[in-house]
């Protein structure tokens, strides 16, 4: 795993956006795996800025997102489709038909997982997968204890993840969905390049465990030690325990 140090969140975002930009420029019809949450917001903002300056063209890019809450329609302001539309899709020239997320309204779990796996396989896999890492080491919604060999599946969210996400639901834990569709570790590991972004002291232990700890389902991010082309871009606080 290659580690790129950033001074702060803004620097982390710019460095991560540089790597994504290089992928888009080198292969205009690439498949980007995208992530949601607070960490990549700045990365998307930087990509939008470069697009507005004429430096990037997303017209041939296809995207597949890591995950989506089960039970939320895409129009819900806390759905991950809504997040992606607000932060990236509506602000660049990407073809909406080439943006893919799990369908949170499809409650037929087996059918939805098969559909999403089929999309990724038909695309020939993912060229670059962007990831955040949770305080408990989760990547996507692959929580501690998840088997490494899974593809897209439905997962019960860990209490720590529900707690972390309630800030997006007016602090009301009862409103936070308890399940999500997520790409599995197997799918993530099959991406040709993986880019992990992390910032802040709250992520320091997870980063330490993912980078230097044993490879174990107890810290899902630790599997990335075995990926042949994984880059971690993190600020000083997130790297403070290394």
Feature locations, PLM:
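N-terminal glycine-/serine-/threonine-rich phosphate-binding loop
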Residues: 1-32
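Glycine-rich N-terminal segment of FAD-binding domains in flavoprotein oxidoreductases
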Residues: 26-52
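A glycine- and small-aliphatic-rich helix-loop capping segment at beta-alpha/alpha-beta transitions
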Residues: 46-57, 80, 144-153, 215
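Ligand-binding beta-strand-loop-alpha-helix segment within the catalytic cores
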Residues: 56-129
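Glycine-rich phosphate-binding loop
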Residues: 124-148
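Class I SAM-dependent methyltransferase SAM-binding "motif I" and its flanking Rossmann-like core
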Residues: 140-185
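ATP/nucleoside-binding phosphotransfer catalytic cores, i.e., glycine-rich phosphate-binding loops
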Residues: 183-186, 190-242
């Amino acid at each position: 795993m290659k580690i790129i140090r950033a001074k702060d969140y803004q620097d982390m975002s710019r460095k991560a956006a540089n790597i994504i930009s290089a992928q888009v420029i080198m292969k205009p019809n690439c498949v980007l795996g995208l992530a949601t949450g607070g960490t990549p917001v700045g990365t998307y903002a930087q990509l939008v800025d470069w697009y507005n300056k004429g430096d990037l063209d997303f017209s041939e890019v296809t995207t597949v997102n890591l995950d989506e809450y089960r039970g939320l329609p895409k129009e819900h302001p806390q759905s991950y489709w809504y997040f992606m539309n607000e932060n990236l899709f509506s602000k660049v020239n990407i073809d909406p038909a080439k943006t893919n997320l799990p369908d949170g309204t499809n409650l037929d779990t087996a059918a939805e997982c098969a559909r999403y796996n089929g999309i990724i396989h038909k695309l020939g896999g993912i060229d670059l997968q962007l990831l955040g890492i949770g305080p408990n080491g989760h990547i996507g919604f692959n929580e501690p204890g998840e088997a490494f060999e899974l593809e897209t599946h439905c997962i019960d969210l860990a209490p720590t993840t529900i707690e972390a996400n309630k800030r997006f639901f007016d602090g009301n834990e009862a409103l936070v969905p308890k399940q999500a569709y997520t790409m599995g570790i197997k799918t993530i590991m099959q991406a040709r390049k993986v880019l992990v972004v992390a910032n802040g002291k709250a992520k320091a232990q997870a980063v330490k465990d993912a980078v230097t700890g044993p490879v174990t389902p107890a810290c899902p991010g630790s599997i990335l030690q075995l990926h042949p082309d994984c880059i971690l871009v993190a600020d000083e606080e997130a790297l403070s325990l290394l």
